[in-house]
Amino acid sequence: MTHTTVLLNEAVDALFCNPDATADASATGAQVYVDATFGRGGHSRLILSRMTPTDRLIAFDKDAEALVEAGNIHDSRFSIRHQGFSHLDELPPASVAGVLLDLGISSPQIDNPARGFSFRFEGPLDMRMDTTRGISVAQWLANAETEKIAEVIRDYGEERFAGPIAKAIVARRQERGPISSTTELAQLVADTVKTREPGQNPATRTFQAFRIFINAELEELQQALAASLLVLAPGGRLVVISFHSLEDRIVKQFIAQHSRDVYDRRAPFAPPKVMQLKALARLRPSAAEVSANPRARSAIMRVAQRTAS
């Protein structure tokens, strides 16, 4: 399945609406933009179409398949790094006019059975964004303790049946060996969770939890947001599209935390830690976009601007 980029024009519009950006390269009229989640290149291609001849676009992605897709972009202004977006801090300080983070998993990733992201297809229980590093979900489940499995399902999937699901996974492992396929896990969850949320497969939350955990998605997001403060030039834009409440909560709290002056109660006469971001917008996809692309329904885009401090 081809990937339809969510909030495509809105995100790029927000990224470029920053006339006050003062990146180090601005003396020559050039700006540096970052697509921190290249995916299948939807945002990058539109960003390139909006850039001047001297601007540069740096993309990041952990997925080797994304790098193959990036090879189809023949533009000297574009480069991509086979890294997660937590590596943003490797860019020079105050050098970037705009950072875009699209936290959604791409349709080709979901719909490729070999990647193991979906309960709809028979495939190996992998779920790694970068298949060249780390262990798969199946490998982790083969040795994980019941309490840890339950913690992951509860904390990252917000699943109220986390305990019974974890116990069922371990019981299955002890009786017949570890789970190795997506459909095995989906069926086990369906057999364990006796209530159904309307319109949702009972395995949805468990699959989300394991994917987030095995890729350290929330930890990497926190690192990337912190790095954005370092690399964004004054006036530079931070645009983040999230797809579930855990991600959006982190983004919302980060922007709020850095959008106000902070006083040290232990030193009431000391100067405050001055705000570093200005919250600008919160946007949801239009009804028309959701109708055309149902995977957009949970998306939330937040925009903030780096202040001069």
Swiss-Prot record:
It is found in: Cytoplasm. GO terms for biological process: rRNA base methylation. It holds the Pfam family Methyltransf_5. S-adenosyl-L-methionine binds at G41, G42, H43, D61, F85, D102, Q109. It catalyses: cytidine(1402) in 16S rRNA + S-adenosyl-L-methionine = N(4)-methylcytidine(1402) in 16S rRNA + S-adenosyl-L-homocysteine + H(+). The keyword ATP-binding does not apply. It comes from the Bacteria. InterPro entries: RsmH, SAM-dep_MeTrfase_MraW_recog, SAM-dependent_MTases_sf. It is an enzyme of class 2 (transferase). Keywords: Cytoplasm, Methyltransferase, rRNA processing, S-adenosyl-L-methionine, Transferase. GO terms for cellular component: cytoplasm. Specifically methylates the N4 position of cytidine in position 1402 (C1402) of 16S rRNA. Belongs to the methyltransferase superfamily. RsmH family. This is Ribosomal RNA small subunit methyltransferase H.
